[in-house]
Amino acid sequence: MGKIIGIDLGTTNSCVAIMEGNSVKVIENSEGARTTPSIIAYMEDGEILVGAPAKRQSVTNPKNTLYAVKRLIGRRFEEKEVQKDIALMPYKIMKADNGDAWIEVRDQKLAPPQISAETLRKMKKTAEDYLGEPVTEAVITVPAYFNDSQRQATKDAGRIAGLEVKRIINEPTAAALAFGLDKAEKGDRKIAVYDLGGGTFDVSIIEIADVDGEMQFEVLSTNGDTFLGGEDFDQRIIDYIIAEFKKEQGVDLSKDVLALQRLKESAEKAKIELSSSQQTEINLPYITADASGPKHLDLKITRAKLEALVEELIERTIEPCRVAIKDAGVKVGEIDDVILVGGMTRMPKVQEKVKEFFGKDPRRDVNPDEAVAVGAAIQGQVLSGDRKDVLLLDVTPLSLGIETLGGVMTKMINKNTTIPTKHAQVYSTADDNQGAVTIKVFQGEREMAAGNKLLGEFNLEGIPPAPRGTPQIEVSFDIDANGILHVGAKDKATGKENRITIKANSGLSEAEIEKMVKDAEANAEEDHKLRELADARNQGDALVHSTKKALTEYGDKLEAAEKEKIEAALKDLEETLKSGSADKAAIEAKIEVVATASQKMGEKMYADMQAAQGAEAAAAGAAGAGATAGGASQQQDDVVDAEFKEVKKD
């Protein structure tokens, strides 16, 4: 059985780790970095770039470079968060036939799980390159506050990437695993994990207990905001720069897609720099132009200014902390450790706010970028049976229920219930002789069903005619360890039953996932073909260079017809290489023609080399014969006895 890898599929960056015995290895990607930007670029020639190469070309290709796709995964197009992103993103977010938010790139309509699968495939390849063997199984992390649709969509992304997702676990829980197994502190501890990433915010209160030598991680409560993160902080800086530039130059940069991409890059850099310095400068020459000529942007931003811009965003993270503490039934003073996860927690103001709320300094000995992937790798080792000393008890983040008479949300499983869990309840009909019931499943905390997220619906038919309130219909909810819901309804009189795994009435159908898996496999084949084509081009370029060099040296020794034949073949090969449409077979055929035409020249070069070597050998032989007569008598006299001394080391 192969190893189960741990993947942190982040909004901004992703990371992959593996357990080797009792030590963890965060794996470097092909660029040598331990984290990979979650950025995917679709090129004109069909090539798909992932990570740093995609990020590098984003300024010149903004409409086809996709970032922060995790904010759209498992979401409906109508959701207000999606509508907010439409106004901000340089790429086109569209409404899919099923009502989900999809993205249109180069006339292709792509689902967020399909795009995220590209990042997961890069993580899979990174692990395979390191291990030297195929990887087919993974534990993937999601924000604790992800709902059922978002978890399902993440699982689909794994499948499209060619991975069997053994478990979906919550990011703060994974970070707690990494922390708990890395630290030597004994006894029971309550920890708070404050996770502010690129696109999402989570807070979890977790109890780590030592039970008969087994470490038990029990999540007491979780809360968060799946649309609050570093991307929003960047946007505040971008808005500020746009406003300042408009004041100074009278030009609105918000309408210029290329300028916006440069601003995004600079805003992110400025934010990072201001975590360690008090002031930074944003300098963007030729940012735009008007009738008076090119315009340059030069702006100083202080840490105080940045903090003023994002103060309200940081404040928004505190309310979920209050709710999580209350739901866990603990007091702030009972928290032993505060763990910071996610790149945004490097910001001094964030650390200050966390300290102010929890009344203690957060721990600095957890890597905020890697802890989540490390925890996922530990859970992978537990699932593979290689680790027996860890038990993880996670919770469902939001209440689950069904719509009952009057549009009321009747809760079946309350938020922060430990999973896996089951619950069944008996309901009846609302009308006389009702022959069928529709079960509508919702997730959320509002009293009325319409205020919550509809996860799915199904019918139970064939109920025998009876007065209202007489039939007994048992509805059962079953949440698995991934936090994914399975619902059943059974008429107790007839035994008729209907069960479904909740697939949101949006989401990808089985057929769509299968098609995307096949497309991904075809893509891998296409990548292989592109690589072979690049190799053929390189071979052709090298042959052109070496043949031209040889022609310069030996051309005059060839007959005119031979020389012309080589030059014609070279010209033909060069034109084929310049043509963007030439395939591998065409290039290889032209290479063969050049090689055949150059055969005579190769023979002449070889003959010349042989002759040169023969002449050298003859000259050396003549010189040696002259020296032998006089040298023979001296031979013994010239031998010097070497004196060796033993050097003793003290």
From Swiss-Prot:
One of its GO terms (molecular function) is ATP binding. Pfam families: HSP70. The keyword Transmembrane does not apply. Keywords: ATP-binding, Chaperone, Nucleotide-binding, Phosphoprotein, Stress response. Induction: By stress conditions e.g. heat shock. The modification Phosphothreonine is found at T200. Belongs to the heat shock protein 70 family. NCBIfam families: PRK00290.1 (NF001413), PRK05183.1 (NF003520), prok_dnaK (TIGR02350). This is Chaperone protein DnaK. It comes from Paraburkholderia phytofirmans (strain DSM 17436 / LMG 22146 / PsJN). The lineage of its organism: Bacteria, Pseudomonadati, Pseudomonadota, Betaproteobacteria, Burkholderiales.
